[in-house]
């Protein structure tokens, strides 16, 4: 009887600790920058982008946001060229993914990634940046270039 009480008390304590930890887990702080896409040196569009430049920020991405403006998105950054893998877990809206080389040029496009889809999206080439924007809103093409003072591009 005494053992059951202690076991129950310990279980309740552990559950409360877990809830406390998860309740204090918060969204990483994302820096916001402004970048433009250029085609033949002419500005195509200006974007407000959240920067995901750490493991924690890249892991969180646009998850759990219920809305994104048509001129907003997220720019994922790495210091090396590698093939990248994405998914749409806990993402509330469809996205277009633009895979960019080290000079900011669009190398690949994955259109209309579906909200909440946990299937993996792979880049075919090694890339340094991935730009996520609201699906179907922009006419960005392979070869277009991201111009961003923040990145010296």
Q: Where in this protein do the model-derived segments appear?
A:
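Bacterial N-terminal signal peptides
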Residues: 9-20
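Bacterial N-terminal signal peptides that target proteins for export
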Residues: 2-10
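Compact, glycine-rich, soluble single-domain proteins
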Residues: 26-153
């Amino acid at each position: 009887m005494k053992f059951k009480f202690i076991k129950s008390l310990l279980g309740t304590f552990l559950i409360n600790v877990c809830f406390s930890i998860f309740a204090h887990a918060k969204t990483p702080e994302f820096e916001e920058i402004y970048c433009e896409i250029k085609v033949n040196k002419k500005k195509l569009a200006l974007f407000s982008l959240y920067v995901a430049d750490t493991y924690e920020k890249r892991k969180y991405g646009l998850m759990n946001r219920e809305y994104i403006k048509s001129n907003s998105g997220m720019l994922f950054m790495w210091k090396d060229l590698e093939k990248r893998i994405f998914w749409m877990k806990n993402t509330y809206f469809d996205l277009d993914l633009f895979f960019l080389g080290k000079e900011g040029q669009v190398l690949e496009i994955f259109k209309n990634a579906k909200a909440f889809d946990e299937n993996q999206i792979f880049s075919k080439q090694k890339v340094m940046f991935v730009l996520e924007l609201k699906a179907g809103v922009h006419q960005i093409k392979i070869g277009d270039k991201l111009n961003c003072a923040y990145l010296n591009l």
